[in-house]
Amino acid sequence: MKKNILKGLVFLVLANVGFGDVTQIIGDYYSIDKGKVYYGNEILEGANPKTAELIGFSLLKDDKNVYYMGEKIKDIKIKNFEKLGQNYWKNDNKIYYRDKKIENADIMSFKVLNEDYAKDKNRSYEYLTKDELKWF
């Protein structure tokens, strides 16, 4: 029995297949394979596979960046990143829904109601389509 296990391990090493080569699936669209982070079949250049984690619908965060649907969100200070709900998060004094900054949101009173709805002291916010955030 021990001989067979040892033979199997030797075979894996000689075949250049290691336990670290196993593809790790992260959510529906992201994966890690052979030290690279992927969105679908596209490599996310610069993404760190050791710190990559799914944080919401199509949102991935590593130690340097936040990605939405495989695209790096610009001007993010990762040390100030805070997840507020499934699709809402804040960075510095800005509130975001997925990859969209919510203009004039009141950061002190902002509350997430569910994955697509939120409110602050001035208004309520509703997600409609990928590119449209409505407030009322």
Task: Kindly give the residue locations of the regions a language model identified.
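Non-catalytic tandem-repeat scaffold regions and their flanking low-complexity/translocation tails
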Residues: 18-136
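Hydrophobic h-region of N-terminal signal peptides that target proteins for export
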Residues: 11-19
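Sec-dependent signal peptide recognition
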Residues: 2-11
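Intrinsic structural disorder
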Residues: 1-2, 19
